[in-house]
Amino acid sequence: MVKESKFSYNSKDEKKYSLGKTFRGDIFNVPETHDMVRSLFDPTVKKSVSDYLIVLSLFINGIVYYYSPVTWRIPVFIVLYSFWRLGYNLGIGILLYKQSKSHSMFHWLKQIQINGGWAKKFVELELSSKLNAQQLNSVPDEFKTWIVFRSLVNLILMNDFTTYMCLVFACSDGAFNQSLSLIFLRWVLGISFFIFNIIVKLNAHLIVKDYAWYWGDFFFRLHNNEELIFDGVFDLAPHPMYSIGYAGYYGCALMTKSYTVLIMSIFGHLLQFLFLNYVETPHIEKIYGDDNLSENTISVNKRDDSVFIGTGGKPLVMLTKNFNWLRTNDIFTVVLALYASIVPIFLPASYNNSIIILAIVVKIGTSFVLNSVLYLQSRFKSWTLSFIKNYGTINISILDNKELLERLSFQNWTLLQNNTLVLNYSMLFTISVREVMYNEKFWQTEWLPLRFILAALMILGQFLTVHQMIDSIGLFGWYYGDFFIGVLSSHKSEVTTLSRSGIYHFLNNPERVTSNLTVWALYLLFNNSNKIFLVIALLFTMNNLIVLNFIEKPHMVKLYGEQNVLKHTSGIEKSINSLFLPNHVQGTIVKLSGSIDKVIQDSSKVIDEFIRNKHNQKPKELSLKKRRNSFQQVIELIRGSTDDTLTINLQELNDQGQLQLLNLLRKDDTDFYNLGDPIKVEWNMEDHKGKDKAWIGLYNIFQTSETRTKTLVSSKGYWIPIHREKYINLSDKIRNEEDCILEDELNRGVVQFSAELLPWVPGTYELRLHANEKHEVLAISKPFDIVVKKIDVPTSDDIGDERLEDFANKLYQGFVSKLFPAVESIEDESNWFLQMHIKENARQVEKLCSTLSQSCGVHLTKKAIVDEKCLKDLSFKISKLRKMLDELML
């Protein structure tokens, strides 16, 4: 982030002055100033006493380096560098902190001018060297304070750099005691880092000029410097002068091959971040506005509050954030982490391979579950629908509040995602600790200290990035909230586009780069001792790519549009293009990236279409289709067969009897009965002799298609004798009732399958006429389907009693009266309760549950049915469910 400046005020161009404004409100022209190097070393620029003292101190550093014993150089310059680095980050930090809070440096200067003495003379001499007489009279004391402060900054920063470079030279003795290839690689990378550092610093100074370089906004404001903007290297990384602006440190460590240089570089860099966090950032927030009070941050916080209100509070993140001792889920997560990361550590070394395999299996399993949930939720709202099935059908009051239902289902998802994430990283911790404890090869690894340092930095990088991501997109974004929740009514004006603040300004998908840093850090640390860490790293990386390209990206395009998702240029991309890449190279990269995106999109569409087709065909429909196709294949094989014996058997079937379906329905060239409707069949036999005890069975055609001359499977009780009097000793009295055998003549008759003689499973069926108490087939009916009749569910907000009763009566006549004849009406509470709770009726209740779910297009549980007082109340619940499902699928 940089301060916008439309005027140049520190270089000789057509506009030498810009307006400044003190915190007291005084307006003044800002005189021209010069950068640090030019102020000290350009002979055309007038020098002050402090400039000569600074140059002298630099020569003293060189003299100390030259004359100090070789064995003393490193410790001497460690001390000197530490002194100047602390002078920078601690000394300047304290001065700026006090200046920000109470303008203390301004008051000190005023006090010096009042008290007089050598300090006043020194300040006047310093100012007269930097400003002419006219400028001295026109600029306010705040600007004069800044000029004096610049001299102190020049002293500290130049000595900080010089002592660091002296330390680098002192530690360079072992820079060339390696193989030529490694030396070449180290120096190429080191020089590249150093040059990159110089480019970043120069570009940063070109943009922010002396005003920001010397913390001018601690002393006064520029009139045209009202807000923070992003430009140049400030698009490349957050706070580039303090982050990537220290790449040269690590380049020097590479060139010298010195752990001392590396550790001191990390030390200096860490102090710089502390300076940024405790000095600069609070002042930036004070002057330019707090990031936490920005429009995006406020919107993100409001959205999180809206989503998690009434659901137990904000969910746990990474074991510590939002932890609540009174929430069982949080305690469970911590116990899970402790159990998975500590208990396995104390198992014998012989368990190493088993634990590693378990970690891989856990990662594959949890990834499959999470990815499947996200994919199906994006396409079909499957997670929310499942939640409605298991919770909404029990608590009907929730069906009046779509937002609450979505929030509750989302809360359950956050628990699943967080626990699986904790479990996976706990397992990684376990196998890493066991590798250190039990694998002797690990301690023989080359460059082990360097590996430890780099691994720690990579893990820290992922940790900090995750926090920045959560700060930018909130818990809602971290947990893929827009997969589960639409725009909240209380939040319609908030966060309706993708967030481009924080880390998302620099990277479109920071998780693509940073979410796998930990596993690759472990690979870097352990790859010499155990190659399985490469498999683990690749597994995590592949899963990340699958989620981003095949699940998250298509969903984001669907919600926010292709232009906003695929065509947006990140800050890093813009900066690299403008600073390092020619136009023709940029064009080639754009084309290549577009080609890769197209391949990914095409692959995603193919997978999406395949799964969508499978999902849209319900299991029952697939089963019916499979069975019907199987039957047709069997018939075609039979008809096309040249087997003489088979032909004779078929002819015998036609001659011995016939079965004619009487009340068959037909639609779209398909013969069918509605589930529960009686099936009437007329039978005929020319030769009745010896067949008095013939019977007709009802079979699923998929089970009987293997043979046409003999039935090899049980009828499962779905059968009727053709003559009532021939089965007088039949224990099953239902088959002796008159509603089963409607007509009974010698050579013909009519029977009816109804009530418990009907299968309550949709499918393709046939009727078979069998010989006396045997399974030899005399005749077979043509195949027909038994289907569930679809009943329109009223879903309007103002559904009245009349429409509700009409709907309930359709359910009663279509299904309930056939399964539970004792229930007399839709408001019969006593018989409904009795029938629903009789143990012997459990199977009938399950049939009703399945049938109503298919007929009404909702997912009902057995508990959802038995908990209602009567059928009318159940109908009202189904109406509410259907309305909720329709709203979710919009």
Swiss-Prot record:
This is Phosphatidylethanolamine N-methyltransferase. The chain crosses the membrane at residues 52-72, 76-96, 151-171, 180-200, 228-248, 259-279, 331-351, 355-375, 447-467, 469-489, 532-552. Pathway: Phospholipid metabolism; phosphatidylcholine biosynthesis. Its EC number is 2.1.1.17. It comes from Komagataella phaffii (strain GS115 / ATCC 20864). Residues 1-51, 97-150, 201-227, 280-330, 376-446, 490-531 are lumenal. One of its GO terms (molecular function) is phosphatidylethanolamine N-methyltransferase activity. Catalyzes the first step of the methylation pathway of phosphatidylcholine biosynthesis, the SAM-dependent methylation of phosphatidylethanolamine (PE) to phosphatidylmonomethylethanolamine (PMME). One of its GO terms (cellular component) is endoplasmic reticulum membrane. It catalyses: a 1,2-diacyl-sn-glycero-3-phosphoethanolamine + S-adenosyl-L-methionine = a 1,2-diacyl-sn-glycero-3-phospho-N-methylethanolamine + S-adenosyl-L-homocysteine + H(+). Keywords: Endoplasmic reticulum, Lipid biosynthesis, Lipid metabolism, Membrane, Methyltransferase, Phospholipid biosynthesis, Phospholipid metabolism, S-adenosyl-L-methionine, Transferase, Transmembrane, Transmembrane helix. It is found in: Endoplasmic reticulum membrane. InterPro entries: Phopholipid_MeTrfase, Phosphatid-EA_MeTrfase_fun. Pfam families: PEMT. GO terms for biological process: methylation; phosphatidylcholine biosynthetic process. The gene is CHO2. Residues 73-75, 172-179, 249-258, 352-354, 468, 553-890 are cytoplasmic. Its main location: endoplasmic reticulum. Belongs to the class VI-like SAM-binding methyltransferase superfamily. CHO2 family. It is a multi-pass membrane protein.
